[in-house]
Amino acid sequence: MSMPTIRAVRALTVRGGGADYHDQDAGHWIDDHIATPMSRYPEYRQSRQSFGINVLGTLVIEVEASDGTVGFAVTTGGEIGAFIVERHLARFIEGQRVTDIEKMWDQMFHATLYYGRKGVVLNAISGVDLALWDLLAKVRREPVHQLLGGKVRDELEFYATGARPDLAKEMGFIGGKLPLHHGPAEGEAGLRRNLDALADMRSRVGADFWLMLDCWMSLDVPYATRLAHEAHALGLKWIEECLPPDDYWGYAKLRRDVPRGMLVTTGEHEATRWGFRMLLEMECCDIIQPDVGWCGGLTELMRISALADARGVLVIPHGSSVYSYHFVTTRHNSPFAEFLMMAPQADRVVPMFDPLLLDEPVPVGGRMKVPDTPGFGVRLNPDVRMQRPYEH
């Protein structure tokens, strides 16, 4: 079978709901008083958008093959990411065979080492990589999970991230992850409010439902350690992303010091096999949580997963909807998945990338069979207005 080549790469941007899931209207739970690295400043505590968490916006990348097939993916990156794709990365994609994904990844990564390695550059590389997998699977008329080796389980089960784990339990999810609302700068009173909120939720969901805390890089080691010990009596399953991503030493100490049986998780804002190698070799966590749209795409996530598997560490990717689902269903060391509750009050199940994507699957009763539609099985919504800020 002769494989087509890639004739065009396009980078588009979108504002509002989409891959940049923080870009929401006022009143959404995700923009509430939630602890962040900026919570040390009172003027930036009440709303995460106040310090610009949503400034990037969504990046949509399309790759078109010589036979007219179009693959696409969405990630966070907006106009900055679009510039990187159009003005730098496109040269490594156009003219290549659709099968040469490894070569294209390697060239994109090494060509951007002097200003990249992590952050928006890796978001852009990840988006291109995901679009390439979507394209190849469509050319072959197969789902992406088939290209990754095939399913190892018939269906996925999910925990829910959002403000209402009690409602998530009613919907059939296996657990609920709450955002932490108060950081160290809010002192003893803030700590007590954090614990009171957890205790209230435990009383609502009962003793056997998983409860976790998402700390979003907002804590220091002493505070995180104390929070873990005081939350242990409330049956906290894990404490997530307590520290800045580069504080590997802090994570290693935290993992040593938390109560026996409590899990330490992180990795949402880590990237590449080298970043995750540090987390694994320094024994920083029990579960790694790479975001496939930020860590380097599927090509890199497979390498990250192999490193973790060799050390007996679980890989539970951060969010990412279909881009995670097609991966998780093919890996034994990814036994469940995360679902971000994107309804404003976290009171119903809606697609993560709504309204940008069509045919995006969602869990029913906390479970899902990953579709066998070619590619990632989703379509761009033609009614969503997109812009192409740069061309090459």
Swiss-Prot record:
Site (Transition state stabilizer): 338
Pfam families: MR_MLE_C (PF13378), MR_MLE_N (PF02746)
Entry's cofactor comment: Binds 1 Mg(2+) ion per subunit.
Keywords in alphabetical order: Lyase, Magnesium, Metal-binding
Domain of life: Bacteria
InterPro entries membership: Enolase-like_C_sf, Enolase-like_N, Enolase_C-like, L-Rhamnon_dehydrat, Mandel_Rmase/mucon_lact_enz_CS, Mandelate_racemase_C, Mandelate_racemase_N_dom, RHMD-like
GO BP term (any one): carbohydrate catabolic process
Catalytic-site annotation from UniProt: 318
EC assignment: 4.2.1.90
Annotated binding of substrate, by residue: 22, 48, 338
Residues at which Mg(2+) binds: 214, 240, 268
Alphabetized PROSITE patterns for the sequence: MR_MLE_1
Cofactor(s) required, per the database record: Mg(2+)
SUPFAM superfamilies: Enolase C-terminal domain-like, Enolase N-terminal domain-like
Function comment: Catalyzes the dehydration of L-rhamnonate to 2-keto-3-deoxy-L-rhamnonate (KDR).
Protein name as catalogued: L-rhamnonate dehydratase
Annotated organism of origin: Burkholderia cenocepacia (strain HI2424)
Gene name per UniProt: rhmD
